[in-house]
Each structure stands twice: as structure tokens, then as C-alpha cells.
């Protein structure tokens, strides 16, 4: 059977906020649709309407334009993708780069689903998380698109062994715990979208490596303090509640605000702590993230 590219899979006429999903058609052709089916089922269970598109690649301008046209027509509110690498298109000529990008055209949050090339048992026994190949293909490169990295929702499990060719036959098996977490995140983003900016709360987290305050926000070749100030000013312009008194005027003023209390610098231990939380309260807040 021949299928179009993109192939719009398991679409239904149903109510609820619409969630775009992009996944590889090769998995469907290999009879590995369990993951997509369970993701769609879990989204529908909480009243959302999944719109799954199965593709061969994102490196094709016609495929990207088709996706944008279809998703805009459906008025999706968030996008989920399992595709690896980034979405930048190939050069259309020796001198020109095709600047069309479906994520920029859609202008929506894009959640990157992770699928581990290890089985669940190996994953649970390991302390390193994603292996180097998964890290490169599903986290490092996709982040150039501005995708929001999530957690593993499927693991590669051995389903049979072909003794004739001495080879294991593996399929991606969905992880219901991961899918439940992802579905709740999708729901939260959709709810957040409906709030006015003045009612939203945002945390900016920067690194605070031990030993020296000079390592706060450290990024080689990056001006982290200035970037934070630019972000805060953008938030203020977009209607987030930031008063002029709370807005640092310079990088120096921002860093002074950050180091006036305790940090990971041992010399700051005599400074006044910003606040205290009991372990129970901390775990309560952490589990709500």
C-alpha cells in the first residue's frame, strides 16, 4: 500500500483543544504504531484532540509547507514531535539557504518526545540517562529549533530473536508513565496559553557552579547577564508583572542582586540566606513542576 507524505493518521472529528503530532512514517510502515496509538488514546482521555502527521523527513520544503497548511487549518494549539536532528532545510542553490521553517511559521510550543535506543531495564539500571547517540540526535541538535525537551516515552525492546540470521528483532514500546507525564505537560501548556501574561509566573534558572561566584551563569562566548536583562525587558513589554524597581539596569546590578545572598561560593556562607524550605515542602513543590 502506498501512503502520502505526510500521511495524516487517526484523525477524528472530535471536540477539545487540538494537538499536532509529527512522527516518522517508517515506524508505521514497520507495523510499529503502538506508540502513536497510545499517545493519541492518552490525549483523548483528557479531552484533547490529537492530529498526527507521519512523515519521511523534515528536510523537505514541500512536506514542511504541507504540515504548516494543514496544522494552521486545524488551529492546533501545541506541537509534539518525535523527529530527530533539526528542521533546517537544505540549500536551494549554492548561495541561498531555504529560510522556511515550519516551527517558526506555526509559532507554537514544540515538545520533543524522547525515545531511548535502550530497553527499559537498562535505562533503570543506568545513572547516565540518554546515551551519546540519543543525546545528540534527540536533544542537542533539536534544541537549535527551540524545541522543548521532555522525557523518554518509549524504549527499544526485543520482541523476538530470528535464529536464522542470529538477530534480535526490536520495536519501540511505549512507556505509559512517560506518556502520562507528557500528556499532563501538554495540558498545562494549553491552559497556560489561555492565561493573560500578567497572571503567569516564570522562573529563569541559571547555572551556579561551585567554588566561585564568577562561574554564575557561565557560558563560553555568551553574555548571560545581558541576555537575562533583555529577556526581562521583553517580558515587561509583553505585559508580565515586572516593576521598574525590580528590573536591573545593568549586568553589574543584576549580578550584585544574585550574589548578595548565599551562593555556591564558600565565602558567601556568612551572607543572609534568601529563604528556607523544609525538605517536605521542597519535595512538594518539586513534584508539582
What are these regions (language model features)?
Residues 1-289:
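An N-terminal assembly and electron-transfer interface module characteristic of large anaerobic redox
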